[in-house]
Amino acid sequence: MKLLAIYLLLVLSPSVTWMGDFSQAKNEAAQKHRLILINFSGSDWCGPCIRLRKEILESDAFVNYASDHLVLVRADFPRQKKNQLSKEQVKLNEALADKYNADGKFPYTLLVDENGKVLKDWDGFPNETPEQFIAQINSFVQQPK
């Protein structure tokens, strides 16, 4: 019985998908009338990036919220050979960085609308709880258009 409960929790738990193509993310955001959260990360070398992912972006509270309210885009810039991205993904990430993160900040997170207009940004690790992070995003989600 316990195994069944665990299985159901895993299957029924909300999940989120981090996209790698900003154009596709904008299309999805337009179709679903959602905002886009872009996260620039160095997943295998940037301590604050890893902390942001583990403490906020992978928290149950954020995953539950994002699954219903956001389109997520991750532009990752790993350094270790075992984590190398495809050449196509590297080009997509570099193009996104040219547009939104020319200074090369890590971590750098932005909330943008479906047209790509920046609504809010977080430079570095946001020293707050997942709930506080969500509240900041939610203030833009609930604004009339």
Residue positions per predicted region:
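Sec-dependent N-terminal signal peptides
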Residues: 3-13
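Thiol-based oxidoreductase modules, predominantly thioredoxin-like and allied folds used
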Residues: 18-19, 62-91
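A short beta-strand-turn-helix
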Residues: 19-36, 66
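Short active-site neighborhood of thiol/selenol oxidoreductases, capturing the structured segment around
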Residues: 32-46
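Loop/turn elements at helix/coil->beta-strand transitions in domains of secreted/extracellular proteins
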Residues: 32-36, 68-74, 105-107, 114-117
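The canonical Cys-X-X-Cys-His
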Residues: 46-49, 109
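Typically the conserved alpha-helix immediately C-terminal to a functionally engaged Cys/Sec
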Residues: 49-65
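Non-catalytic, surface beta->alpha helical segment in thiol-disulfide oxidoreductase systems
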Residues: 99, 103-144
